Amino acid sequence: YIRNGCTYFGINPDWNCPMEGGAFIPDCGSMAKLIEASTGRFPEFFGKPSKHTLDYIIQETGYEPDEIAIVGDRMYTDIAVADQSDVMSILVLSGESTREDVKTSDVKPNVILEDLSEITKML
């Protein structure tokens, strides 16, 4: 079906899913690449960094983009969707991304925190 043009979707383009103890397992993006290698087609993602989910949240809640902040640890999904959607982005360095990633990324977070506990200082 996919080879014949059937539209298919993925949740996110993440390559690895962090696990307890610092281990990683393949995530949705890895699986999508596997399917692409076989079919020549890559999915349309509706999770981050796609705006679909955030647009739905805005529509359903009535919040304006300037009333929303996205908090995340991945530059290429969490911070990217915030950048596309003109909402505040807060990068936490306790996950995947590093300060070096921020320097080399096309998208930049509005705020960088060492970990999520620092968010209370912003409130």
Task: Spell out what each predicted region is.
Residues 1-123:
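Asp-based, Mg2+/Mn2+-dependent phosphohydrolase catalytic module
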